[in-house]
A protein has these predicted regions:
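Short loop/turn motifs that connect adjacent beta-strands in outer-membrane beta-barrel proteins
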Residues: 20-21, 34-42, 54-56, 92, ...
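Residues on the lipid-exposed face of transmembrane beta-strands in outer-membrane beta-barrel proteins
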Residues: 36, 47-49, 83-87, 97, ...
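Repeated loop/turn-to-beta-strand initiation elements of outer-membrane beta-barrel proteins
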Residues: 43, 93-95, 146-148, 210-213, ...
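Transmembrane beta-strands of outer-membrane beta-barrel pores
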Residues: 49-55, 99-105, 133, 142, ...
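Surface-exposed strand-loop-strand hairpins of Gram-negative outer-membrane beta-barrel proteins
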Residues: 51-80, 187
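Outer membrane beta-barrel transmembrane domains
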Residues: 58-60, 67, 225-338
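Short sequence motifs at beta-strands and strand-loop junctions characteristic
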Residues: 72-78, 125-132, 189-195, 249-253, ...
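Outer-membrane pore/translocation modules
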Residues: 107-247
Length: 338
């Protein structure tokens, strides 16, 4: 690998959340890279770091502020390192593999002693750590990069493999001396248990030598409906969970879109854009049963990057403008029944 381009990227998200303090959106990899048609190297190693903390609760677009005020909010700390190795086959074709390493910590009361408990030990933590779901993709520039130097569009098609442990378990304390061992919450599981199809579309257009536009589109199709993992945290599912199909975890689709403008000054690049990411309540293929937390986040996304010979550094800190915890299929069934 004589010609190896290494990219380090850092994405930090704070105060991002859906209902129950959870963000179920998993890392998509390479979301901080604004690649152009690089003809100088055959290999590229991308190390994409992403961290976020979630603690707010939403019903629709309305924040449930009383959860924070009462101290019963759920707090998630999630970190992922996406390791992506890309091999350029020709000027237009490339192959890539992404392997995420994930570490999660979840703090709550309702999963343990209960939100009404006055015990000072009522808030407990569950954790998960390991390899996430691996993605293998093929990419093609739709326009010959040699002929089109101002702009191009790259399409990607891949397969997402269920290499992450989607049955990860930890301890749920019920009193100071009694506990249950069971699957951790869906938001901190290392994988979803499904084999998916990853669709990507990336484009750029240079308005001048310094000013350019970029866009990224990503959609993960997960045909599997449920993965069979219990949501009862080591206990027995209640009648309503069984009736409304939330006793096991779903395998939902996922999407992400980014658009923006970047300005380059020698080796420094500054970008500003918008970012949309979320989980739909209904999948493109397969059923919609099982427990999921659908919704979306709209953010502004400043990005700064710097190039050091064969190493590129990226950093991004998105700021959420809108959060919407939409109804799942089960939520709709409950609403119709009541």
């Amino acid at each position: 690998m004589k010609n190896l381009l290494i990219i380090f990227s850092l994405i930090i998200l704070t105060k991002v959340s859906y209902s129950q303090g959870c963000v179920a959106v998993r890392s998509t990899g390479n979301t901080c890279s604004m690649d152009q048609a690089d003809l100088s190297t055959k290999w590229k190693l991308n190390l994409n770091n992403r961290y976020f903390r979630s603690y707010k609760h939403f019903v629709g677009k309305e924040e449930q502020k009383h959860r924070v005020d009462s101290g019963t909010q759920v707090i998630n700390h999630s970190y992922s390192l996406d390791i992506t190795l890309t091999r350029k086959l020709t000027n237009r074709w490339a192959l890539g593999i992404t392997v995420p390493v994930i570490s999660n910590v979840r703090s709550s009361m309702y999963e343990h002693y209960g939100n009404t408990s006055k015990n000072p030990n009522a808030r407990r933590k569950t954790k998960s750590f390991g390899i996430g779901d691996t993605r293998i993709s093929a990419y093609r520039w739709l326009i010959d990069p040699v002929k089109s130097v101002k702009g191009n569009v790259q399409a990607g098609l891949g397969i997402k493999l269920p290499t992450g442990d989607f049955r990860y378990q930890d301890i749920f304390w019920k009193t100071d001396s009694t506990y249950l061992m069971g699957p951790v919450d869906q938001s901190i599981q290392l994988g979803d248990g499904g084999t998916g199809i990853a669709l990507e579309l990336r484009g750029y257009y240079n308005l001048s030598h310094q000013l350019g536009l970029y866009s990224d589109l990503y959609y993960l199709v997960n045909p599997r409906e449920q993965n069979g993992v219990s949501t009862a945290r080591g206990g027995t599912p209640n009648a309503n969970a069984i009736k409304y199909f939330t006793s096991t975890m779903s395998v939902p689709d996922q999407y992400m879109a980014r658009v923006g403008v970047n300005y380059m000054v020698k080796k420094l690049s500054i970008a500003a854009g918008a970012r949309l990411e979320g989980i739909p309540s209904s999948d493109l293929i397969g059923g919609d049963g099982g427990f999921r937390r659908p919704g979306y986040i709209v953010s502004v996304e400043p990005v700064i990057s710097y190039e050091l010979k064969k190493v590129q550094l990226y950093a991004s800190v998105p700021f959420a403008l809108e959060r919407n915890r939409t109804q799942s299929n089960s939520d709709k069934l409950i609403t119709a029944a009541t």
